[in-house]
Amino acid sequence: SSAQPLSLEEIQKLLAQDCLHLVCAVDEDERILGMLSLVVFDIPTGRRAWIEDVVTDQAARGQGVGQGLVDAAVEHARELGAKTVDLTSRPTREAANRLYRRVGFLQRETNVYRKSF
């Protein structure tokens, strides 16, 4: 599902979290072409990372923006000491799923559950 636009205050609150890293791709005029959220956190089995909210501008699709974002996020997670990087993607997002496999993500044999409030 798509998120509603955020206010400046909401963005500042997100960015104040130590665990959240926003990865952005910009063009030569500093226009945002895409972005993703990288969350890095510690649990008893080690430091982990999670990629969420991968978004690429419609006009920039097919130009390597998504791959650049994912590659940068994975490298940043590695630099921060994460043992793994996880993400989810709907089966209907065929291009995104091809990208994730191409850059080395493996589909896990698990179920993902969610409880919404």
Regions found by a protein language model. Give the residues of each.
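Acetyl-CoA-dependent GNAT
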Residues: S1-G46, V70-D71, H76, Q107, ...
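Short coil/turn motifs at secondary-structure junctions
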Residues: F41-I43, A59, T92
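Conserved acetyl-CoA binding element of GNAT-fold acetyltransferases
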Residues: R47-Q58
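Conserved acetyl-CoA-binding loop-helix of GNAT-fold acetyltransferases
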Residues: T56, G62-E75, R98-V103
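Conserved active-site alpha-helix within GNAT-family acetyltransferase domains
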Residues: Q67, E79, P91-E109, R114-K115
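Conserved GNAT acetyl-CoA-binding A-motif
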Residues: V70, A77-S89
